[in-house]
Amino acid sequence: MLQDVPKPFLRQGPASVLETERLTLRRPSFADVTAIARLANDRRIAENTKRLPHPYSQDHATAWVRASANDRRGSVFLIEHNHSPIGVVGVDWDAEEAPELGYWLGVAHWGQGFGTEAAKAAIDVAFEDGGAENLAAGARVANPASRNILEKCGFQWSGVELHRFEALGCSTPVDRFRLSRGVWSSLKNWGSSVRR
């Protein structure tokens, strides 16, 4: 219910900076290429992210930053903690079934609640600014931490599919999840991010 949404959320155009309790989410820039490549160049991340290659070079990071600069919806964010990049979160509006939430964190930042905090902020943008009615997401069956993030954000399990993972070079089972605008709205008391 939009009348219950704090005023900072009710603005036109894509968010450029989101602030949560501990994180800053902002558009990535070419100045971030080295940090992105350093964080993403870990096989454990690539094995749980469909399109992330391994090894992950600065050329990959440069191409990704260039592509995210063309994201007119402003739904791709670099996640920062204490002014240092720790990962990425965003919504793919070109996904087949519904806009799809995706994220990854550098391994040193796993298990601290950052994924859930960043995902909630990106979800808010998708529903409030993007006008999404539903969001989709997926997590490898072998990745319970990612499934936990999705469940904490209100996503509901919708089935299992096979998806190809670039770093694995094969298809692997993925739990699929959905989040409707109605469920998101009812869970909105999870706190809010502040936009600048």
Predicted regions: what is each one?
Residues A67-R73:
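Short loop/turn motifs at secondary-structure junctions and domain boundaries
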Residues R44-R66:
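Conserved GNAT-fold acetyl-CoA-binding loop/helix
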Residues M1-R43, E47, V76-R196:
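Acyl-donor (CoA/ACP) binding surface of acyl/acetyltransferases
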